[in-house]
Amino acid sequence: MQVSVETTQGLGRRVTITVDKDVIENAVKSELVSVAKKVRIDGFRKGKVPMTVVAQRYGASVRQDVLGDLMQRNFVDAIIKEKINPAGSPQYVPGEYKIGEDFTFSAEFEVYPEVELQGLDAIEVEKPVVEVTEADVDTMLETLRKQQATWKETDAAATAEDRATIDFSGSVDGEEFEGGKASDFVLAMGQGRMIPGFEEGVVGHKAGETFTIDVNFPEDYHAENLKGKAAKFDIVLKKVEERELPELTEEFIKRFGVEAGSLDGLRAEVRKNMQRELKGAVRNRVKTQAIDGLVKANDIDVPAALVDGEIDVLKRQAAQRFGGDEKQALELPRELFEEQAKRRVVVGLLLGEVIRTHELKADETRVNALIEEMASAYEDPSEVIEFYSKNNELMNNMRNVALEEQAVEAVLEKAKVTEKATNFQELMNQTATA
């Protein structure tokens, strides 16, 4: 086997391989012998067909299969010999072949980039320092009450906390536009579902009133014909409802798994859950900054094959989230996922190099701690832990999570980490919008 390697462009490589004619002929003969033992041809007993007849009938297809197999096997041997690390499958380009002669083919593919980590000591990370206060617990209890609230119709003017049922009809420059009209639309105030100024225009009005509000569509509005345009909405306010919050009774408290039904017990449970959320939010905030800094400090080329594979993964994940099938997923425009896919590949390559250079392996103690932390959010943590322990795929996924955390910690050891005091709500808001 003769091998030559050349760089085509960037990470692209072309390996040209020549296979000796004797290797081909021996492989063809061996395969024909195997075929002769199995085929049935009229006039001959099974296994007794002369080789000349077998070769005449099956020689061409056997030779084609042998050449395909030899291309794959010789490619693998070549990249091992040349110490090449391909990213993705190669594209084979067979040369002209004549029986009794050597066979030359080429394989085109991309390689993984050579990553040499740099700039780790210039990465800046702000670590949030937060405590769950009694006021934070009070706010969370109020949120729980709102989630369990009922709605009661009122004659009072609508407030920013109410729910309104309206008919509306919008126009721009006196012309109605698509999607600008609805009847019996239930508007929950404070959720930001409408364009800026719409909810504010409803506040202060009572059921039975008809009025017009003036608003402006944002410059980044999704409909091109409405971006930045001034609009009028004619509104009929049909019903206003106000929240009725439940009292913190024993019955209410027991809904959240606090069997004793005591307020102190509920506060303790809420605090525990908030502290778990806080721990995860701080960890993710620090991790995001560390990875952002790592990516910024290391500009690397990425193999298109890896990006394509990641795009397919993201498409399938999107289909699962929105109830589509795999065929529909693959038809989604790749442009929707390309940037995210490329970043995921870059992050994977960089963290992989951190893991390699630091000789990291998943810490089983950390793996178990992560499983226990995740399981603590369920009603029966021991059942979840046991389920994980018996599922190799889930355990390996958790080992990958642990290994990624260890890699991030290795980056943080060299980064400039400062602490910044903040509060629970501010951190949660940052996490939600990240």
Curated annotation (Swiss-Prot):
Gene Ontology BP, a term: cell division
Reaction equations catalysed: [protein]-peptidylproline (omega=180) = [protein]-peptidylproline (omega=0)
SUPFAM superfamilies: FKBP-like, Triger factor/SurA peptide-binding domain-like, Trigger factor ribosome-binding domain
GO terms under cellular component: cytoplasm
Compartments (UniProt record): Cytoplasm
An example molecular function term from Gene Ontology annotations: ribosome binding
Assigned EC number: 5.2.1.8
Xref: Pfam families: FKBP_C, Trigger_C, Trigger_N
Keyword Transferase listed: no
Keywords: Cell cycle, Cell division, Chaperone, Cytoplasm, Isomerase, Rotamase
Matches recorded under Gene3D superfamilies: 3.10.50.40, Trigger factor ribosome-binding domain, Trigger factor, C-terminal domain
NCBIfam families: tig (TIGR00115)
Recorded family membership: Belongs to the FKBP-type PPIase family. Tig subfamily.
Purpose of the protein: Involved in protein export. Acts as a chaperone by maintaining the newly synthesized protein in an open conformation. Functions as a peptidyl-prolyl cis-trans isomerase.
Name of the protein described by the UniProt record: Trigger factor
Species of provenance: Erwinia tasmaniensis (strain DSM 17950 / CFBP 7177 / CIP 109463 / NCPPB 4357 / Et1/99)
Gene name of the record: tig
